[in-house]
Amino acid sequence: MPEVAVLRIGHRPERDQRVTTHVGLAARALGARGMYLAADDPGVALSITDVASRWGGDFFIENDVKWRRCIQDWKAAGGKVAHLTMYGLRMTDVIDDIRTEERVLVVVGAEKVPGDIYGLADYNVSVTTQPHSEISSLALFLDHLFEGKELNREYPDAKIRIEPTKVGKKTVER
């Protein structure tokens, strides 16, 4: 399976904090190694880092990256770029090819995505051809990419973990 990171572009600090935080949390929970945030919003970065420190894993977040440079650096290091959009090739048609890559940077937009992204991406991936959220696109993409294996991942360094129960809620704290 590839090493995966997410590049969040178009984040508007005055408007998108909750959604961008959820992009990072979904990325972490569903198998990505980290997130690059193409905006300066240390509050979002802190929220995601706080969750990762309590719930385990080595998820990273880099705040205020330049999106074009991030893509160029990723590709220069041999990685591939998958841009999630309504307008790309159907995810079900390309996911097997993407799964064979060693490193994948998943680009998730907020507001209108710069047109250059389509040309810079190795894969423009349509997670349905209908409008829906970037969070659902990312979640579906990662689940298909990792074939559901991320759903039962456990983090040995977690300070908090959920113990599955038929009824009620049970957490274990270390």
UniProtKB/Swiss-Prot annotation:
Entry-linked Gene3D superfamilies: 3.40.1280.10
Entry EC no(s): 2.1.1.206
Keyword tRNA processing among UniProt keywords: yes
Record SUPFAM superfamilies: alpha/beta knot
Catalysed reactions listed for this entry: cytidine(56) in tRNA + S-adenosyl-L-methionine = 2'-O-methylcytidine(56) in tRNA + S-adenosyl-L-homocysteine + H(+)
CDD domains named among the record's database cross-references: aTrm56-like
UniProt: S-adenosyl-L-methionine binding residues: 84, 109-113
Family: Belongs to the aTrm56 family.
HAMAP family with a match to the protein in the record: tRNA_methyltr_aTrm56
Name recorded for this polypeptide: tRNA (cytidine(56)-2'-O)-methyltransferase
